[in-house]
Design a protein with these regions (language model features):
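Conserved short histidine dyad/triad with adjacent acidic residue
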Residues: 59-63, 90-117
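Short acidic-glycine-tyrosine-enriched beta hairpin
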Residues: 117, 123, 139-166
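Short, acidic, Ser/Thr-enriched surface-loop or helix-capping motifs
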Residues: 126
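A short, N-terminal "cap"/entry segment at the start of jelly-roll beta-barrel domains
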Residues: 4-96
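Glycine-rich, histidine-containing beta strand-loop boundary motifs that form or position
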Residues: 135-137
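Catalytic micro-motifs at enzyme active sites that drive phosphoryl/nucleotidyl and oxygen chemistry
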Residues: 76-79, 108-122, 155-157
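Short beta-strand segments in beta-sandwich/barrel cores
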Residues: 129-133
């Protein structure tokens, strides 16, 4: 279940500074380390030009030849190699009225498909109104785990990851 982390961090960082800072000793099992990584991520999110500049550079340099190399969908951009068991990526979630979503369809971008993340992650809203998510809880002990199994879901909330939210 997500938790909101206050991110009133001043100053901005480059992608390289963020990758280096997190690689210097991030341990997701230690709360203080997660909090420190959140500060670094918030500073990167305060850098209002890095992502647009990176995308333009990658398009100019024909980066699209590596599309899919990260094992993610078309909206994911891998920002760093795996270092210390973690990496940085950016996701672009088109709005309902965006041409690419209308052309490709919502399911091609995994919209409206329930899923359970089997890993923890920090995420920060960077641009736009933010993607909306519905959050549910389940009783893992009640699940056998076979394909097609009906699972009881308990609705928790709907929220949006807007700019400045972490």
């Amino acid at each position: 279940m997500p938790r909101e982390i206050p991110s009133p961090v001043a100053g901005a960082a480059t992608l390289e500074e963020t990758v280096d800072a997190i690689a210097a000793g991030f341990d997701p099992r230690v709360e203080e380390s997660v909090e420190a990584a959140a500060v670094h991520l918030a500073r990167l999110a305060n850098n209002r030009t890095f992502l647009g500049d990176l995308l333009l550079d990658q398009l100019r340099d024909a980066h699209r030849t590596e599309l899919g190399a990260g094992g993610y969908g078309p909206q994911a951009i891998v920002l760093s190699p795996v270092v210390g068991g973690c990496f940085l990526r950016a996701n672009i979630w088109p709005g309902e009225r965006d041409k690419c979503l209308r052309a490709s369809g919502a399911t091609s971008l995994v919209y409206g498909i329930a899923h359970d993340h089997n890993f923890d992650f920090l995420t920060a809203g960077y641009f736009g109104p933010g993607y909306r998510s519905d959050y549910y809880e389940i009783e893992y002990g009640d699940i056998a785990g076979y394909r097609g199994e009906t699972v009881a879901l308990r609705f928790v909330e709907r929220s949006a990851l807007h700019r400045g939210r972490m």
